[in-house]
């Protein structure tokens, strides 16, 4: 339960400075608060915050990011079908407004992880390959994040019993 306090409260000001410096310094306001709640395991409250922000938001990229955050929270709750629905909403926006390719790759990766979890290797592979396509555009060829994507693709091929293809990615 949240309680309204005065902005002049000394402890609150100290906490605010600490939070701003240590947690998501690139974020502001309610979005940052939602991320902190999620990090603290208060996933339901984080979802509530993200939904409120989503209702007020007009920027398409930010809406896509918010859908992705709600999807991640749903995945934290093991509500994977709901998570995928929110990730897909994020993707719809990201594909129409591709100025945030990094966010789109993250969302594809989130879906791939869910399919990995359920050993749905065909779908996982599809999304890992989408991540790879974007990451190759954004990252240098020796970036460790690319290695992770290649490994994930190899694991998907391994799950499909396509060992020769799996070896090419490991």
Residue ranges and their predicted role:
Residues 1-29, 37-45, 55-57:
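Long, contiguous interaction/recruitment modules in multidomain scaffold/adaptor proteins
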Residues 22, 58-59, 97-100, 139-142:
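Short coil/turn linker motifs that delimit alpha-helical repeat modules in TPR/alpha-solenoid proteins
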Residues 31-39, 62-76, 102-117, 144-159:
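Conserved alpha-helical positions within TPR/SEL1-like repeat arrays
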Residues 48, 52-69, 99:
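Short, charge-rich amphipathic alpha-helical segments embedded
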Residues 52-55, 89-99, 132-137:
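Amphipathic alpha-helical segments of tetratricopeptide repeats
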